[in-house]
Amino acid sequence: MFKKYKNQDLDMAFWWKKNPKTPSDYARLIIEQLNKFSSPSLTQDNKRKVQEECTKYLIGTKHFIVGDTDPHPTPEAIDELYTAMHRADVFYELLLHFVDLEFEARRECMLIFSICLGYSKDNKFVTVDYLVSQPKTISLMLRTAEVALQQKGCQDIFLTVGNMIIECIKYEQLCRIILKDPQLWKFFEFAKLGNFEISTESLQILSAAFTAHPKLVSKEFFSNEINIIRFIKCINKLMAHGSYVTKRQSTKLLASLIVIRSNNALMNIYINSPENLKLIMTLMTDKSKNLQLEAFNVFKVMVANPRKSKPVFDILVKNRDKLLTYFKTFGLDSQDSTFLDEREFIVQEIDSLPRIISSTTEVSNNNASSSNVASITSPSSVMNNQSSILTHSTSPDSR
């Protein structure tokens, strides 16, 4: 069922014969070993011994939980183990000493944690309920990810803890705790880091947190305007300054969120901002076709909005002709009928926008018409230095 390291079967067979344990002893012995890491008299040799013992106890715990022992544990024995682990705050203590553990031990901890989250009794997720009652463990998990980045050579710790966070997000009660924790905002910063694996893991955590439970996110996160403003600021930074993957994934996340009906508050604030429109239009001219398409999924919502803010309307009017030129080549090679229908609709919406009359053009004698044009083409400061934003072709190959 699980990948085994060299000589694991031999080591475990010897260990079981030498140290038979009752279910509750697993938790006690793990805690005893973890406490040794804090001893001021701990030598490097002794630390290695403690690390080895922790790894063995964690492997033994995993085998017991999945019933991979002889004899197989009874349901009562497994219940006893879960109770003992929760009572001793085993996961909290493991996270406190995560940096001290061996790679194999951290991996076993992640597997045990995932198994425990899925364990149910009487239609209740026992470990999930425990973590809800002890949110300090989730908070420590989020902080441990940051601590790992502050230490040299601890990238694997970040990735392991990241997987544990994603497992938590699958459960609405735990996702709620994560969304409320200020530490979540740090992952927007982690997503901008140059390390590909760290950035990707951070984006996966953010995507999971904001999409796994749409009703929870809309009712308890985006119902707060302060959260919306901060989220937009953070996501825009990723879209503007991140790597290609970061730009694409963050734009994709934003697009998926603003089309959810219950996220109207987020959508209305985002699509009525001229600065946001300028950013999206810039992304639509990226050399990557994939990123262009993700940006289009945001742009189409802005254009289709029947109640555009005046600054947004002015930008679209000012760029009307350039947008129409842009869409002559955009997405023509797509076979997606839905996309093609949306593209055609957006082109029609843009084409229906008023045309700007140049100041050098002879003005009509019709005073009413002249007045109307003047009101539409009044100078706008929104598009300073942006006049050529949509002039280049979308022909480069996608990444």
UniProtKB/Swiss-Prot annotation:
Ranges annotated as biased composition (Polar residues): 383-399
GO molecular function annotations of the record: protein serine/threonine kinase activator activity
Disordered: annotated segments: 363-399
GO cellular component terms, semicolon-separated: cellular bud; incipient cellular bud site; mating projection tip; mitotic spindle pole body
A Gene Ontology biological process term: septum digestion after cytokinesis
Bias kind Low complexity: ranges: 363-382
Membership in a protein family: Belongs to the Mo25 family.
Protein name, entry field: Protein HYM1
Source organism per UniProt: Saccharomyces cerevisiae (strain ATCC 204508 / S288c)
